[in-house]
Amino acid sequence: MLESVSVDLQGNNFTLLVIQTHTTCTSQIQLELTQKIKNSPSFFSNNTPVVINVENINHHDDWFNLYQTISNIGLFIIGVCCCYNKKLKNIITQSGLPILTKGNIIKSHKNTIKTNYTKPTFDDKTNAISKTQTIHTPIRSGQRIYARNRDLIIISNVSSGAEVIADGNIHIYGSVRGRVLAGASGCEQSQIFCTKLSPELISIGGYYWLNDQIPPEFLGKSARFYLQNHTLIIQHIS
């Protein structure tokens, strides 16, 4: 008689936002976080999971105040990263929160803009993406599309609150208001092409920008994203 299996252990990849503070002033942190949430209401919701980068936190009182401030906003703290203070690490560990390594979390870099369409060069080996998935219908709020081991072409709109993911490149011939994640399996040579840009999030190979990090002159326009030296680069498409 075969035994029934009640539990499976599965590996998976999840996108986590990291909050890094550059001040211990909780009122300022609360004000800026609240504004970011207001600017991207479909991306954030009650209990949105986040990781806190505590690299700039050295005193346990600052940690407790920061934890309380972020929790009161409605975000759900699932762990911390970049904890190099041994005393603080012990306090956080005893509270039950895991301390994550940088490899577990999604990364963010400053805006970089290039106006000329020059082909980028990369040091990493190219991941083999041999197929393409094409979608001709709108991607509605709440929908999630994942093109595993292939490129993704969407000939329609991506609504706010929707998420489109591909291990390869992503082409969107329509309005983009949701989340777009290319190179989901780690391929940093993946690119994103959009004809009408206004996304909640853009990510390639784990490096991402939120809407308010995208230079305003690109919003509503056609644009191309790619990575160069682990930095996101955006260009106009004429």
Curated annotation (Swiss-Prot):
Pfam families documented for this protein: MinC_C (PF03775), MinC_N (PF05209)
Which domain of life does this protein belong to? Bacteria
Q: Which GO terms describe its biological process?
A: cell morphogenesis; division septum assembly; regulation of cell division; regulation of cell septum assembly
Residue spans crossing the bilayer: none
Subunit annotation: Interacts with MinD and FtsZ.
Family named by the database record: Belongs to the MinC family.
Which NCBIfam families does the record associate with it? Answer: minC (TIGR01222)
The UniProt entry, under PANTHER family, shows:
SEPTUM SITE-DETERMINING PROTEIN MINC (PTHR34108:SF1)
Q: What is this protein called?
A: Probable septum site-determining protein MinC
Which species is this UniProt entry from?
A: Blochmanniella floridana
Protein encoded by which gene? minC
